[in-house]
Regions:
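Long, contiguous ectodomains of secretory-pathway proteins
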Residues: 85-87, 108-114, 119-121, 128-133, ...
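A composition-driven surface/loop motif
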Residues: 2-3, 9, 30, 34, ...
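Enrichment for repetitive, rod-forming helical segments
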Residues: 12, 36-37, 758
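N-terminal secretory signal peptides that target proteins for export/translocation
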Residues: 1-25
């Protein structure tokens, strides 16, 4: 150790010499030197150095100082510690000492755990009062705490305390767990990078990382290898067990932007999110995550067990946003979703960006992605997100809602339907969505309604309903309201026995005359849908309402079947634009319902192909299902068929019949009907003998007409319905489109529409 004298001499610029060669100084000189040394020592601020703190040496308390941390261990206190590192002398032997971190408002504490092992679990030695037990590492205060991981760290807490505890209150700050540096302190970015790890285990009713008993928890993870296990009733990462009567605690607020995470919740709790009677708010932007609930009622990622002790739901809700990273597995407990809500909660799930969900597995009666039993769901899947597998073991939707409620009441049954609202858009891809039984692949769980929108460039591989559940739409006893728009591909929408491929579940009966299954399929500027749907086959007994009553096979698109003598819900099905549909019935009707039979479509665009087959393989296609391209003339021309005498002074235009090669007019069934064309000066008029009719041209025809001097087109149908369009305006609408681009001009009673290449340009009509 350098003496004060030597330090003073160095400061003065002198090199000390040994006492053997120093002449004896007078007392006065020695006094002067001592006075100078004392003055220097008192006036200097010694630099703060990093220090390692060993947990075996006692409990450690850390708080934020002015330029670093204030660290206290036993009788030792150090101010302004700029690099606080906590270690174990022997990480193979757990210490029973603890770490307490407190960050005041507006300040940040940075701490490194370096191969620390703490175990303060004493079982139930002190009874059932959490205050009698210890916490391995506790984070408090209104400021922020960052914990860096080096090596392998293990934290195990006692009864009522989280392994790494951070209780969320109105005034609390944030806890961030990170692995920003290598174990030697160097920056990441090489092949020799090391990964710090943390294994945290909570005591009874306490999270592995997050909230303690009857407390909410807040956790942010940016990196590292994290393994967290919650105690009974608590999340692996998130909330401790709440109190359903006091309505306190249990909520989990978790953000993950990196790392490899394995989280296991205790019974009634989520793997990541809410504890028992708690809600889960989880945001994932990156990382590789495996999250599992054990026992009952908690989601893999999302809400814990929701209860209604006093007519008000306490907990259960799951709000999950995943915009990146990989969910390797998210498994919910019995009656809970894989990703979404726990028992009775609302599942609000957004999956977007480049997120990948490899496997989302709902427990029995819970959805793979969506809600638990008796809960509704609001789901958006968009961007470039990929869902490889979303599945319910039974009665929940693969993607959608959990099971609804059905119970006897007097001579009847009370049906309390859940609702699965699902939107799939952008470039999202669903490879497999499946229900084990009763629920839909995408939409409603058993005893659930499915409201589904699929649009943009979305791709659906397999959407498979369980017995009596639609592939896309309603679960058993539930209607389906499905909208499919744009460049959507559905490779296989397979209904379970008695249920539609797309539409309603089996045994769905109307509450009112207005109760309908609704399916809308149409092309947009994004492109045309390509759909393959198959209705479920016969169910020989085992139905929900009457287990002895068999059910007939169902439509590929439309309604599920009902028992003999029951009233089947009708279907409203609309198809617009250009579509490709391959529909195979499980019974007799491919597209429609048993009451009205096959639904017919009219006015579809050129290129449309609808194929219909019944369960026997017979073709049951309808007129208008196939709309072929008209033969393109080599050179469309306008030729007078009867010339009128020219006026003597040339001042009067005469209307004359003409023929436009390649132009045809079709009726509502897609069949060609008689039409005439006349020209008066620069105006060409097309007349059709029908109230509902479509004139079919191509842009090549219109360009030729312009070259021949035609400036205005008129389309006239019965009841004196006429609309006009400027040739220049029509060509300017799609100036770069090729000659073969279809132009379809439709009159439907008093309404008129104009499409060019499938795009709506009705605004051009006058």
């Amino acid at each position: 150790m350098i003496s004060y004298r030597k330090l003073a001499m160095r400061v003065l610029g002198h090199s000390p010499v040994s006492a053997a060669r120093t002449a004896r100084r007078s007392t006065a000189k020695r006094a002067a030197a001592l006075a100078l040394t004392a003055a220097l020592v008192v006036g200097m601020t010694l630099p703060a150095f990093a220090q390692d703190w060993y947990i075996e040496d006692g409990d450690i308390s850390i708080s934020a100082g002015e330029t670093g941390n204030k660290v206290t261990q036993g009788s030792t206190t150090k101010e302004n510690d700029t690099d606080t590192v906590i270690k174990s002398k022997d990480s193979s032997t757990a210490s029973s000492n603890t770490v307490t971190i407190n960050a005041d408002e507006g300040k940040t504490v940075n701490v490194t755990l370096d191969n620390v092992t703490i175990n303060v679990d004493e079982g139930y030695e002190h009874g059932y009062d959490p205050n009698a037990y210890k916490t391995a590492v506790s984070v408090t205060g209104s400021g922020n705490t960052n914990i860096e991981l080096n090596g392998n760290n293990t934290l195990t807490s006692g009864y009522g305390h989280a392994g790494l505890e951070h209780n969320k209150t109105d005034g609390s700050g944030t806890l961030t767990i990170q692995d920003e540096k290598n174990d030697d302190g160097s920056a990441k970015g090489s092949a020799s990078d090391t990964t710090g790890s943390l294994t945290a285990t909570g005591g009874y009713h306490s999270a592995g990382i997050g909230g303690s008993d009857k407390q909410d928890g807040q956790v942010t993870i940016t990196g590292g290898e994290i393994t967290a296990t919650g105690g009974n009733g608590a999340a692996g990462i998130g909330g401790g067990a709440g109190d359903k009567y006091a309505a306190v605690g249990g909520d989990g607020d978790v953000t993950i932007s990196g790392g490899t995470i394995t989280a296991t919740g205790g019974s009634l709790a989520a793997g990541i999110g809410g504890g028992a009677y708690g809600n889960g708010t989880v945001t994932v932007t990156d990382g590789d995550i495996t999250a599992k609930a054990t026992g009952m009622y908690g989601a893999g990622i999302g809400g814990g067990f929701g209860a209604i002790p006093k007519d008000t739901l306490i907990g259960g809700n799951g709000t999950v946003t995943i915009s990146g990273g990989t969910i390797t597995e998210a498994s919910g407990g019995y009656m809970a979703a894989g990703i979404g809500s726990g028992y009775q909660g609302l599942g609000t799930v957004t999956i977007e960006g480049d997120a990948v969900i490899k496997n989302a597995q709902g427990g029995e009666a819970g959805a793979g992605i969506g809600s638990g039993t008796y809960g509704d769901s609001e789901i958006i899947i968009r961007g470039d997100a990929v869902i490889e597998n979303a599945e319910s073991s039974a009665n929940g939707a693969g993607i959608g809602s959990g099971q609804g409620d059905l119970y006897p009441d007097g001579d009847g049954m009370v049906i309390d339907l859940t609702v699965g609202n699902v939107t799939i858009e952008g470039n999202a891809k669903i490879e497999n969505a499946k229900s084990g039984s009763g629920g839909s692949g995408i939409g409603g769980g058993a005893v659930g309604i499915g409201n589904v929108i699929i649009r943009g460039n979305a791709q659906i591989g397999n959407a498979t309903g369980g017995d009596e559940g639609a592939g896309i739409g309603g679960g058993v006893l539930g209607t389906g309201d499905v909208t499919i728009e744009g460049n959507v591909t559905i490779e296989n929408a397979q209904g379970g026995a008695g249920a539609a491929g797309i539409g309603g579940g089996a045994e769905t009966q109307p509450d009112t005359e207005d109760t309908r299954n609704k399916v809308s399929i149409k092309s947009t500027e994004a492109g045309s849908p390509n759909i393959t749907a198959k209705g479920g086959g016969v169910l020989n007994g085992g139905g929900v309402l009457d287990e002895n009553a068999p059910l007939a096979g169902a439509a590929a698109i439309g309604s599920g079947s009902v028992a003999d003598g029951a009233t089947e819900v009708k279907s409203d099905i609309t198809v617009e634009g250009k579509v490709t549909i391959d529909a195979t019935s499980g019974g007799n009707v491919a597209i429609g319902d048993s009451t009205n039979g096959e639904t017919r479509f009219s006015g579809l665009q050129v290129g449309t192909t609808i194929t219909r087959r019944n369960a026997k393989g017979d073709d049951v296609s309808q007129p208008g299902d196939v709309v072929r391209e008209p033969e393109k003339p080599a050179q469309p021309t306008v030729t007078p068929t009867e010339r009128a005498e020219a006026p003597s002074n040339g001042s009067v235009e005469v209307e004359r019949p003409v023929t436009v090669e390649g132009l045809y007019v079709a009726n509502v069934l897609g069949k060609q009907i008689t039409h005439t064309c006349t020209q008066n000066g620069t105006t060409l008029t097309i007349r059709a003998n029908g109230i509902v009719a479509s004139a079919h041209l191509t842009l090549g025809m219109v360009r030729t007409l312009k070259a021949q001097g035609v400036k205005t087109l008129v389309f006239t149908t019965l009841l004196s319905r006429s609309t006009t369009v400027s040739v220049d305006a029509l060509l300017a609408a799609e100036p770069d489109a090729p000659d073969e681009t279809a132009v379809v001009w439709t009159h439907t009673g008093p309404r008129a529409a104009l499409t060019i290449g499938g795009a709506d340009h009705s605004a051009l009509l006058k």
